[in-house]
Amino acid sequence: MVRYVKFSRTANRGVHISAEARINERIRVPEVRLVGPNGEQVGIVRIEDARKLAFDADLDLVEVAPNAKPPVCKIMDYGKFKYEAAQKARESRKNQQQTVVKEQKLRPKIDDHDYETKKNNVIRFLEKGSKVKVTIMFRGREQARPELGYRLLERLANDVVDFGIVETRAKQDGRNMTMVLGPVRKGKK
C-alpha cells in the first residue's frame, strides 16, 4: 500500500509551536524580560536568575510572549492561570448564541390557507430567534415560470417584515428557489 503525504512549504518552517506555554525548565533562552508576580517590570535578566526568583516565590516562570526579543516571562501560579483561562473559555462558549436555521418549503401554486399556515410557521420561527430558509420547490412546467417563485417570496418577505429581514435575496438553485430570513434584532433596553 502506498501512502501519500502532503507537505506544505509554509507550514512551521522547522519551528515547533506548542499550544501550551513553556514554563520553568522548558524555557531554553539565555535571557528574558521578566515581569514580577504583581505585574511590575523587573527588566532583562538571565534565565537562571528568573527561575531562582520564581522558585523563591514558590511560583512558576511562564513564557507569555515567546516571539518577543528577548522573550517575555512572568512569575505566576501556572495552575491557577490555566484554571482561569479555562473558566473564561467556558464562559465565552456559554454566552455564544447557537444560530438555528429552520426550513419552510412551499410550492409556487400554493393555496391561500396553506400560505397563511406556512407564513405563521415562519413568523413563529423568527419570533424564537431562528433564521428561516424559505424554499420554493418547482416541478415540471413550473420551472419555466420562475417569476411565480420570486413573487411568492417577495409577498412572504413583505408579510413578515415586522418579524424578520431578508438576509439572502431569492435565488434560483436548480429546481428550487431559496431565500433566507433573519429575525429582527430588538435594541437593548
From Swiss-Prot:
SUPFAM superfamilies: Translation initiation factor IF3, C-terminal domain, Translation initiation factor IF3, N-terminal domain. Its main location: cytoplasm. GO terms for biological process: ribosome disassembly. It is found in: Cytoplasm. Monomer. IF-3 binds to the 30S ribosomal subunit and shifts the equilibrium between 70S ribosomes and their 50S and 30S subunits in favor of the free subunits, thus enhancing the availability of 30S subunits on which protein synthesis initiation begins. This is Translation initiation factor IF-3. It comes from Corynebacterium glutamicum (strain ATCC 13032 / DSM 20300 / JCM 1318 / BCRC 11384 / CCUG 27702 / LMG 3730 / NBRC 12168 / NCIMB 10025 / NRRL B-2784 / 534). The gene is infC.
